[in-house]
Swiss-Prot record:
This is KH domain-containing, RNA-binding, signal transduction-associated protein 3. GO terms for biological process: mRNA processing; positive regulation of RNA splicing; regulation of alternative mRNA splicing, via spliceosome; regulation of mRNA splicing, via spliceosome; spermatogenesis. It comes from Rattus norvegicus. GO terms for molecular function: identical protein binding; mRNA binding; protein domain specific binding; RNA binding; SH3 domain binding; single-stranded RNA binding. Ubiquitous. Highly expressed in brain, heart, testis and in Sertoli cells at all stages of spermatogenesis. Expressed in neurons. Detected in cortical layers of the forebrain and in the CA1 to CA4 regions of the hippocampus. Belongs to the KHDRBS family. Coiled coil: none annotated.
Length: 346
């Protein structure tokens, strides 16, 4: 009986007129089930011990009836079909857009639908995405769940979401443009104001005389010891020194000195490289040295640019107490000297 069943189905299919679409659909489905050995409707079991690969398929409906003006097929495919390819690679599944409206040429789609061939039978169904998985049972259902979660993002009728913006950027890149044409990334020397380096600007001072150009500062993160003058460029304002405003206005015939030569080595401290390894190494090394190495003399901490040492401070103190410049300091012991008997009298 089974040997004659398949030839009878094939003969009946050939005798049917193409206008009987539903009859052809039922015959094709029966032929497909018989060829796959699914003629008997028997309950299927999953053997997780052997862990044999199983085939899992699911149809996902595309909401074209609710949103007829939105191009879901174009959003699913993406530029040159790359979006659907990446989605299949990420979920490890096979996806196919099937159903009515899945082909661009509507006339050809109608012709293939009326042809009655089994491979074009899906054109009679609603527009959907067929997800197929071939893997062990647990892995198959995990992949299917991942695919259903990811494909849901493509079925939202939004023209300005992240997926659409990425597709437009990819389309621009494929058409010959740059992938990052909207926001160019340029590392190295930047035209913007750099961090830690002041741009030399010439300003008008009081009396109409041009002031001196601003000195180039030390990059951020590199501390300088107190009392030590920087050798880079002109001397900047420090503690104890008069500000340029307090020095008075220069005479009318005064000419400012030529600006100092610009050092090319400052180019490495621009904004883009501010968080690079060079910046970190210099800043952390300088901080480690300043906290680990003890001070060599008191002038490193107490000399604020006056040019005075420890002797000058000592002589000034003695003159204040003795009220005489030419007498030797008194040999009287200071009160802070250690005594054997703290409560003894003088």
């Amino acid at each position: 009986m089974e040997e004659k069943y398949l030839p009878e189905l094939m003969a009946e299919k050939d005798s049917l007129d193409p206008s009987f679409t539903h009859a052809l659909r039922l015959v094709n489905r029966e032929i497909e089930k018989f060829q796959k050995g699914e003629a008997k409707d028997e309950e299927k079991y999953i053997d997780v011990v052997i862990n044999k690969n199983m085939k899992l398929g699911q149809k996902v409906l595309i909401p074209v009836k609710q949103f007829p003006k939105f191009n879901f097929v174009g959003k699913l495919l993406g530029p040159r079909g790359n979006s659907l390819k990446r989605l299949q690679e990420e979920t490890l599944t096979k996806m196919s857009i099937l159903g009515k409206g899945s082909m661009r040429d509507k006339a050809k789609e109608e012709e293939l639908r009326k042809s009655g061939e089994a491979k074009y039978f899906h054109l009679n169904d609603d527009l959907h995405v067929l997800i197929e998985v071939f893997a062990p049972p647990a892995e198959a259902y995990a992949r299917m769940g991942h695919a259903l979660e990811d494909i849901k993002k493509f079925l939202i009728p939004d023209y300005n979401d992240e997926i659409r913006q990425a597709q437009l950027q990819e389309l621009t890149y494929l058409n010959g443009g740059s992938e990052n044409a909207d926001v160019p990334v340029v590392r190295g020397k930047s035209t913007l104001r750099t961090r830690g380096v002041t741009t030399p600007a010439i300003t008008r001072g009081r009396g109409g005389v041009t002031a001196r150009p601003v000195a180039v500062g030390v990059p951020r993160g590199t501390p300088t010891p107190r009392g030590v003058l920087s050798t880079r460029g002109p001397v900047s304002r420090g503690r104890g020194l008069l500000t340029p405003r307090a020095r008075g206005v220069p005479p009318t015939g005064y000419r400012p000195p030529p600006p100092p030569p610009t050092q090319e080595t400052y180019g490495e401290y621009d904004y883009d490289d501010g968080y690079s390894t060079a910046y970190d190494d210099q800043s952390y090394d300088s901080y480690d040295n300043s906290y680990s190495t003890p001070a060599q003399s008191g002038a490193d901490y107490y000399d604020y640019g006056h040019g005075l040492g420890e002797e000058a401070y000592d002589s000034y103190g003695q003159e204040d107490w003795t009220n005489s410049r030419h007498k030797a300091p008194s040999a009287r012991t200071a009160k802070g000297v250690y005594r054997e008997q703290p409560y003894g009298r003088y």
